[in-house]
Amino acid sequence: MSSVKFLQNLKRINEEDLRNLMEKGETFVLYVRSERLYDKVKEIFDVDVVFPELAKSFEGIPFYWGDADELKELNVIPPSVLIFKEGKPVEFLQGIKTWAEYTRKLKESLLC
């Protein structure tokens, strides 16, 4: 069973959407997951649950998600959270992290 249901309030993006956000110089957070690997990589479920909660804690910052198979240009191993500032990736978190680590990295990257 997929847990995409946890992500239903966040916008799903594809490679074209990502390119547009980067070209516009947007600041945002992107979660890259994999439906194909969902049953094999337990951490995907964990980040599926945590990522929407992070979005609630950082209101005003757009949080998106996408499938690794649709975001191939990124070439990341899911689950991964990428922080973009002014269209450029400034932080990369692979696998599940502690709440404190996520919030610290988000604050450092977005509020500087």
From Swiss-Prot:
SUPFAM superfamilies tied to this protein: Thioredoxin-like
CDD domains: HyaE (cd02965)
Organism name: Aquifex aeolicus (strain VF5)
Highest taxon of the lineage: Bacteria
Protein name according to UniProt: Uncharacterized protein aq_668
